[in-house]
Amino acid sequence: MSRQLNMDTLRQNFWKEEYLKEMMLRYEWQRKYGTLVKAKQKAKAASRLPRKLPTLLPQASVAPPPPASKTTPSKAPSPAPEPLFLSDMYPVAPNTKALLYEGISHDLQGRYQYLNTRKLDLPETRYLFPITTNFTYGWQLGPPTKQELVSCKMCRIESFFRKNGAFALLDPRDLAL
């Protein structure tokens, strides 16, 4: 049994046009982004190559510098070097940090107790600035409000279900505006 090929001139022209559109799209993409892709590939290939250490040539002995005269004024002491790693968080209080070294996490001490204590602090007091957009949203919420539950079950049932039936016309008071 042979397969039927439903190709008439109209369908054949359609597929030819689709093929040409795809080819033009690929060509345009290649023209637009081809150089960027090649540059990235070259950079990646260059990073994979092993780096060679420079060869050091023996140098002639250099005379030591002349001793500084005692009459020259001494330089002012340089300021303290800045720390290499700047943290996003405020420093931890010493008593909270001491929790790390007391016991082990298995006994709900040590790191476990330290993390739970840190979790109790508000993000505003832990971080210098909002790290993510969720922080910004959360910092604007404020303290949570307590919602009181209705004590009787019938009050909840009567307020939850519609009083006038499922298919009855809606009461104007039932619509949320």
Swiss-Prot record:
Disordered: region residues: 47-80
Pfam families named among the record's database cross-references: SPMIP1 (PF22589)
Highest rank taxon of the organism: Eukaryota
InterPro entries: SPMIP1_C
Protein name as it appears in the record: Protein SPMIP1
Source species of the chain: Mus musculus
High-level lineage: Eukaryota, Metazoa, Chordata, Craniata, Vertebrata
Gene behind the chain: Spmip1
